[in-house]
UniProtKB/Swiss-Prot annotation:
UniProt keyword Mitochondrion, yes or no: no
Phosphothreonine PTM sites in chain numbering: 351
Residues the record marks as carrying a glycan: 27, 35
Segments in the Extracellular topological domain: 1-50, 108-121, 185-204, 281-294
GO molecular function: lysophosphatidic acid receptor activity
Protein name: Lysophosphatidic acid receptor 1
Pfam families to which the protein is assigned, alphabetical: 7tm_1
Keyword match Membrane: yes
Family note: Belongs to the G-protein coupled receptor 1 family.
PTM annotation, UniProt: N-glycosylated.
Segments in the Cytoplasmic topological domain: 76-83, 145-163, 226-255, 316-364
Gene Ontology BP term (one): regulation of cell shape
């Protein structure tokens, strides 16, 4: 009997711990992961949760309607059939998708979270990640397009429709891959000790990667717009010494400054707090990040509602097209481009390029 006892395998404590850490928990309930992370999982609807859900649904409806209006306006008005407007339409499509993704989230949050499986929870979060990533990537693409046109002294980028389609496909492909990464393996289901507090099924390393990726994109946008502004300011100051219209140059520079401040300010206000919160979730365990999670999530989603206003509503031609669509009026520009249509294109384009071409009457 002693021999039989000694022949049985003995698992040491370190080996047992290693085996336990490598165990996957894909069959566990969502409550299991939330309890481990310390994140509260509601059992019933309270006043705060109802208010957040009501506000979220309202924002979603506005996002979808506003961005749908932008897409229709660009489609019906042939004066908008240029690369910059195709990118703006794609941005509107991305933000429309963000509204749908967030709408899905609203009906699968709060007490409804308990009913989700691991797969559906990852799908819910993946839709949000994809929608937000594609919106940021579109903002970057627009910044790059503006940078190219200004420094080449063009009103519109000389880019073929095929290249625009390639850019759009690359943006969506990258965003879908980013959103799907946690579902295909970069999660904490088999690495339970490294689960995030804010996203209990997400790995800390993925959240750090995603936050840094978006922050780097933000920095690139700041650099691009700062370079544009510096170039235009230098040109206007140089030409004001040899022209009779310094006030016009000064007004052009200030108008550009306002546009850049609005664009960058909206991005900073809506995105930076949430991205910093993700980093604090990993780097600062004692920080109470969960207390601000829902607020910053709503704030980030507001960016999708603001993009149509920032990039489209400042355009007088776009505003007129909006009114014609809402009033069911037929636009004169839907039948085809008219002579001098380039001169009536985006006021935002004119703002950027007027300082560069202040002596070029074909742009005025």
């Amino acid at each position: 009997m002693a021999a039989a006892f000694t022949s049985s395998p003995v698992v040491s404590q370190p080996q047992f711990t290693a085996m336990n850490e490598q165990q996957c928990f894909s069959n566990e309930s969502i409550a299991f992961f939330y309890n481990r992370s310390g994140k509260y999982l509601a059992t019933e609807w309270n006043t705060v949760t109802k208010l957040v859900m009501g506000l979220g649904i309202t924002v979603c409806i506005f996002i979808m309607l506003a961005n749908l209006l932008v897409m229709v306006a660009i489609y019906v008005n042939r004066r908008f059939h240029f690369p910059i407007y195709y990118l703006m339409a794609n941005l509107a499509a991305a933000d429309f998708f963000a509204g749908l993704a967030y709408f899905y989230l609203m009906f699968n949050t709060g007490p409804n979270t308990r009913r989700l499986t691991v797969s559906t929870w990852l799908l819910r979060q993946g839709l949000i990640d994809t929608s937000l990533t594609v919106s940021v990537a579109n903002l970057l693409a627009i910044a790059i397009e503006r940078h190219i046109t200004v420094f080449r002294m063009q009103l519109h980028a000389r880019m073929s429709n095929r290249r625009v389609v390639v850019v759009i496909v690359v943006i969506w492909t990258m965003a879908i891959v980013m959103g799907a990464i946690p579902s295909v393996g970069w999660n904490c289901i088999c690495d339970i000790e490294n689960c995030s507090n804010m996203a209990p099924l997400y790995s800390d390393s993925y959240l750090v990667f995603w936050a840094i990726f978006n922050l780097v994109t933000f920095v690139v946008m700041v650099v691009l717009y700062a370079h544009i502004f510096g170039y235009v300011r230098q040109r206007t100051m140089r030409m004001s010494r040899h022209s009779s219209g310094p006030r016009r140059n000064r007004d052009t520079m200030m108008s550009l400054l306002k546009t850049v401040v609005i664009v960058l300010g909206a991005f900073i206000i809506c995105w930076t707090p949430g991205l910093v919160l993700l980093l604090l979730d990993v780097c600062c365990p004692q920080c109470d990040v969960l207390a601000y999670e829902k607020f910053f999530l709503l704030l980030a989603e507001f960016n999708s509602a603001m993009n149509p206003i920032i990039y489209s509503y400042r355009d007088k031609e776009m505003s007129a097209t909006f009114r014609q669509i809402l009033c069911c009026q037929r636009s004169e520009n839907t039948s085809g481009p008219t002579e001098g249509s380039d001169r009536s294109a985006s006021s935002l384009n004119h703002t950027i390029l007027a300082g560069v071409h202040s002596n070029d009457h074909s742009v005025v």
